[in-house]
Structure formats: structure tokens, C-alpha cells
């Protein structure tokens, strides 16, 4: 019985080292994401909070919510484009139509990445796939 328990114990140890996880994120990525979120919070406070409010809930029918936003989380490139170039026209967020205009904010690519990382990881949003400056630079106006 003792031998069986030892074999099972060592088998579990070996098995635990061979498994992989689709959710694994290298520690360096975690550190970069954490730093980006920290920087993004400052940018959000300066540039975005007056319309989208401190809690990211926006103003009903005027400014769309960022908190628990289906648009933000499902339309990553369009969200980056909106911050980078501004947006006009109709968008639907959480089933509600918004027709207001958001002007271009004049942020640099790294600042856009930081604010996107902040808003996609705050107020009930979770995005472990860090948005990079290179990703922002690759987003065109059209």
C-alpha cells in the first residue's frame, strides 16, 4: 500500500510539470500589463473621466459605458481606432445605441495602449492579452 501511494504521489508530481495551460501568461507579460494599466489609469483620469465618469459607466444615451462593455471587449480594433482617430456615427454598446461624437484625443500610441489596457481590465472587464504600442500603430483610420 505504501508503494502504491508513493507511485501515485510521484506520478502526480511528474504529471503536474507536463501540463500546459491556455491561460498561462509569462511573468514578464504580467509585469508589463500591470505597468501599462497603472499608466493608463492616469491617462483615463486626465482625458476620459469627464465623459465616461470615474466608474466607467458613462452617461446614459450620451456617452457609452466602458464598464462591462460588450463593444469594448468584443471590438478591440474598433475601440483602439475610436481613441486614436475619434469616432462619429452610431455604435451599440450593451444593446443601447449611441450617436454622439468623440473627438480625436491626440494621444501617442503608447498612451492609447496604456489607456486601453486600463479600461479593458477595470470595472468588470478582463483582458489578459496586453495591447501593445505596435498593435495601436497598426490600426488605420478606415
Whereabouts are the PLM-identified features?
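Electrostatic cytochrome c docking/interface patches
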Residues: 20-43, 138-139
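Axial heme c-ligation environment in periplasmic c-type cytochrome domains
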Residues: 60-67, 88-142
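Sequence/structural segment immediately N-terminal to covalent heme-attachment motifs in c-type
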Residues: 33-59, 73-85
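Short alpha-helical patches at coil-to-helix transitions and adjacent helical residues
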Residues: 3, 37, 109-112
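A short alpha-helix capping/helix-coil boundary motif
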Residues: 25-26, 48, 57-59, 94-96
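Bacterial Sec-dependent N-terminal signal peptides
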Residues: 1-24, 31
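Active-site catalytic pocket residues across diverse enzymes, especially alpha/beta-hydrolases
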Residues: 70
